[in-house]
């Protein structure tokens, strides 16, 4: 836990969680603070000058969830998905920049593909992982390797035998 003087710039709501975005005196930069993690707020009554170049829409343009800003570089991401997931992504895109690749660009095995220009934030990676084996990252290679490391970590976790005699709470 730490204290900072925060000059508030905007509030972001994502996945039912509120984020307070502002200039943090401790960090000297714009930061996002999940409201559920803020232990105490005190209004100092001080005035501050809002940065002229801050625009909330631009700050979050390439992200999903609560992460935003220049720390997270946007990359062009291509995924191949099952037909079931494709139907879902057509109705609820992963990101506003999402476009379905035309038939001439279909994956070798005929799976539908989608492209998007998005920041590779932890919440975006978690969203991709939530589709399990029904979504494959084709590009960029760095994201593909990250997904493989996460898959290996899951395999290691679940390969460890646990007693089936454990009693679960009712």
Language-model segment annotations:
Residues 1-78, 83, 169:
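Core beta-strand-centered patch of the WYL/Sm-like small regulatory domain
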């Amino acid at each position: 836990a730490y204290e900072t003087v925060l000059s508030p710039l905007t509030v972001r709501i994502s996945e039912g969680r509120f984020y307070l975005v502002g200039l943090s005196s401790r960090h000297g930069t714009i930061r996002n603070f999940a409201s559920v993690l803020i232990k105490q707020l005190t209004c100092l009554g001080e005035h501050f000058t809002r940065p002229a170049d801050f625009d909330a829409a631009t700050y979050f343009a390439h992200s999903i969830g609560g992460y935003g800003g220049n720390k997270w570089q946007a990359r062009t991401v291509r995924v191949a998905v099952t037909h079931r997931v494709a139907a879902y992504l057509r109705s609820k895109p992963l990101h506003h920049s999402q476009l379905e690749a035309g038939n001439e660009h279909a994956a070798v095995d005929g799976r539908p593909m989608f492209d998007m220009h998005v920041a590779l934030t932890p919440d975006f990676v978690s969203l991709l992982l939530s589709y399990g084996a029904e979504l494959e990252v084709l590009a960029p290679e760095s994201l593909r390797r990250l997904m493989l490391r996460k898959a290996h970590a899951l395999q290691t976790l679940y390969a460890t035998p646990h007693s089936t005699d454990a009693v679960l709470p009712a």
